[in-house]
């Protein structure tokens, strides 16, 4: 089962000015090995440096996804508790 989250994507180089956009991403919860608070994105959002119209109260999480011998990290909207709840939500089909 895949879970839909909203990822914060950075484009551009640090020297020329970093720009950010949002996109939907589908994650397999069975491959997530860690979720932690991402304070830098929260600070950038409070300064108005992220996507226009994004609520300044949003919190962000960095998710580490297992890729076998390595991992990949993405930043998503939501505090670690909320993201963890979404990732652990299971839909079961009862057979009678």
Question: Could you say what each language-model-derived stretch is?
Answer:
Residues 1-96:
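Eukaryotic intrinsically disordered, low-complexity regulatory linkers and tails enriched in Ser/Thr/Pro
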